[in-house]
């Protein structure tokens, strides 16, 4: 019970009004605080600040990854090259802006119910664009079949201007386009993964996707499903 302790606590609090007691109280308070600061410093040693990534807007430095873009109606939008764009799920305004940008095909890799797929297809086709649906999990790595569908479309439609999206445009989209960079543009797995981070891939939540991309060159070289693409160059 705390009730019997209240008079004692009250008297101790009143003592702090005395200047001498206040100095003594502060001196005792400093000891645990200093110990906490020392313990934190041991557990978190100082490191030099990491270098900031090269900005795509810095004229003094080359653009290392895709170009970030501002597009009304969609977020996390990026231009990888002249025919391949990426980003989040667009709203109605976003689809209109993509059509004005010259996008000819929307590639939706969300795994969603058929009603949502039907509505998006209708909206996209009403704007004169093509709609491609490759449903992929937001938590698991893509299957070989899902990537084969994506690679096959790129190979068979080299003049299409694509916008690839999932929900937020960071995790699933990042994995698909990292695989594209490795296969068609011969990027290293590390560089492809760094571009995933550049477009806000959430490594903490999706370690399996990171490991998948790090191991993708070896998997691509061995899987029979990817045999038709092993001698590919950039589709342009």
Task: Locate each region found by the language model.
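Extreme N-terminal basic, low-complexity initiation segments
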Residues: 2-10
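Short, low-complexity interaction segments enriched in Ser/Thr/Pro/Gly
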Residues: 10-12, 48
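Bacterial N-terminal signal peptides that target proteins for export
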Residues: 15-32
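Bacterial N-terminal signal peptides
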Residues: 30-40
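Cys-dependent protein tyrosine phosphatase-like superfamily
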Residues: 38, 42-162, 175-236
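Short cysteine clusters
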Residues: 166
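Glycine/aspartate-rich loop-and-adjacent alpha/beta segment that forms the canonical ThDP
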Residues: 172
């Amino acid at each position: 019970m705390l009730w019997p302790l209240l008079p004692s606590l009250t008297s101790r609090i009143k003592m702090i009004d005395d200047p001498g007691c206040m100095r003594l109280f502060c001196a005792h308070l400093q000891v645990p605080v200093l110990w906490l600061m020392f313990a934190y410093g041991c557990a978190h040693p100082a490191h030099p600040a990491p270098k900031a990534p090269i900005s795509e807007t810095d004229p003094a430095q080359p653009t290392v990854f895709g170009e970030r873009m501002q597009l009304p109606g969609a977020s996390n939008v990026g231009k990888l090259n002249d025919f391949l764009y990426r980003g989040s799920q667009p709203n109605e305004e976003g689809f209109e802006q993509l059509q004005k940008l010259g996008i000819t095909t929307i590639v939706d890799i969300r795994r969603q119910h058929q009603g949502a797929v039907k509505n998006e297809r209708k909206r996209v086709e009403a704007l004169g664009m093509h709609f491609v649906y490759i449903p992929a999990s937001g938590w698991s790595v893509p299957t070989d079949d899902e990537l084969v569908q994506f690679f096959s479309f790129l190979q068979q439609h080299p003049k299409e201007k694509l916008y690839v999206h999932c929900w937020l445009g960071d995790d699933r989209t990042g994995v698909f386009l990292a695989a594209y960079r490795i296969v068609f543009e011969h990027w290293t797995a590390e560089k492809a993964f760094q571009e995933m981070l550049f477009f806000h891939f959430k490594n903490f939540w999706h370690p399996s996707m990171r490991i998948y991309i790090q191991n993708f060159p070896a998997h691509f070289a061995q899987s029979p499903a990817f045999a038709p693409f092993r001698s590919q160059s950039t589709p342009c």
